[in-house]
C-alpha cells in the first residue's frame, strides 16, 4: 500500500513537470512578446491622441474670465432706498 502511494505521487509529479515544460515560454521570447505588445499599445495611444487633438475646438482652449464675486442682486420692495419694488444690488 505504501509503495503504491509513492508510485502514484511520483507519476503525478512527473506529469506536472512534463505539462509545465511543454507550456513554458523561453524568457527571451517572452520579453520580445511584451515589447511587441507595448509598441502596439503606444501606437494606438498616439493615434487616439492625434484624433483628439483634431477634434478639439480651438475656442475651448481659451481661458474665460470667471466672475470674481457673486451677484448679490435681488428683487425686493421698499429696500435699498427704493420707494417701490425693484432690484437691489449690494456689493
Swiss-Prot record:
UniProt keyword terms in alphabetical order = Antibiotic, Antimicrobial, Cleavage on pair of basic residues, Disulfide bond, Hormone, Secreted, Signal
Look up the coiled coil feature and give its residue ranges. Answer: none
Source species, domain of life: Eukaryota
One of the entry's Gene Ontology molecular-function terms is: hormone activity
Gene Ontology CC annotation, any one: extracellular region
- Quick one: signal sequence residues? 1-24
Disulfide linkage: 73-89, 76-79, 77-85, 80-88
**Major localization listed first in the record, in broad terms:** secreted
Per the record, the GO terms for biological process are:
antibacterial innate immune response; cellular response to progesterone stimulus; cellular response to steroid hormone stimulus; defense response to bacterium; defense response to Gram-negative bacterium; defense response to Gram-positive bacterium; intracellular iron ion homeostasis; multicellular organismal-level iron ion homeostasis
Please state where this protein is localized.
Secreted
InterPro entries this protein is in? Hepcidin
Please indicate if the UniProt record lists Disulfide bond as a keyword: yes
Residues forming the propeptide are 25-64
State what this protein does: Seems to act as a signaling molecule involved in the maintenance of iron homeostasis. Seems to be required in conjunction with HFE to regulate both intestinal iron absorption and iron storage in macrophages. May also have antimicrobial activity.
Give the family per the record: Belongs to the hepcidin family.
This protein is called what?
A: Hepcidin-1
Organism, scientific name: Danio rerio
